[in-house]
Amino acid sequence: LEDVAQAHGSTWKGRYLGTFGDAGCFSTHERKLITTGEGGFILTDRQDIAAAARVLVRYGIENDVGGVKLGSNYKLGAIPAALGLSQLAKLDAKLTGRKRIGDQIRAALSGLGWLTEFEIEPSSVHNGYSLVYQVTDPKIEVWPMSEWLAKEGVVSDTWRYRYKPMYNMPLFQPYAKQCVNAERIIPRTITFPCHEGLSDEDIAFMVDRIAAAPKAGAS
């Protein structure tokens, strides 16, 4: 089961993410590259998984049989579905725009010695959902800095969603396993937007705020 909620259009070794496992689960939340406002879809080439998914989203009803299990009404309405299809037609243009803007932001941030971008595997294509960096200077407190940036309008997902290892969340604590690398990496991680709607002025403002953030966040 692939969690590819943010991976629309991304590839690895020439193959689309979401096609490696038995099923790929995508989100179509309003901030994703393909959006229906809310919702998502499952990508699978297994007939049994596709059939089970159709039953689940249609109240547990199987065609020609009727109710076979308890289900829910998870069907996407016609209007959001039409919106999603229109977004799909724009995906290639979005990927191109995000690459251009991402490269522009990377170049502008390259002089900040306290920031290091997570390496993108050479045989992969990154869709530009966001740029992900590590704050490598141990003297910089990442959380206050992220909070200050958010107030300035540059919001990191690690701050927005309060990232932490999942086993630190109440739901998963009974299954906790210590993941020392996650414990070390997450508190030093920060993300920056690079969507195709950013203008040159937006990028200049964002880079200026990021450059000022370590001192401003510490004050």
Show the residue positions of the predicted features.
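Short clusters of hydrophobic/aromatic residues that line enzyme substrate/ligand-binding pockets
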Residues: H8, L17, T28, I34, ...
